[in-house]
Amino acid sequence: MTDGADMPCKAKYLLVVSMDVDPDHEALFNEVYDREHIPNLRRVPGVLGIVRCKREELVMSIGGETRTMRAENEPAYSAIYELESPAVLTSPEWTQAVEAGRWPTQVRPHTRNRRHVLLRAMSEPSGSLTS
């Protein structure tokens, strides 16, 4: 798993991919994601950075009180891909990378509750708004 050293984000687009994995395949999931899937996708032109995350309990102050926030059915694992453009996601290099290695045959079939969300940044790293 990456340590967040790629932050802060300087990309105009973020792809957030989230999923759960069958417990019996969790070790393989993490091994393949870290050693194969991310390295393959980092080589794709237009991929500026990748960080993996695992959901944790969220306790925060909001509305004058401390609350435990619960997001029903939120997947346990997420990967955030920093992209130059949404066109990266349909490039031949991306198409090849997402089907490389053990991911499509040994890991993907054991994932569920998958979500893919594309976000466009509304501010520059300095905090100024973009158009």
Which residues does each predicted region cover?
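Macromolecular interaction modules
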Residues: 1-131
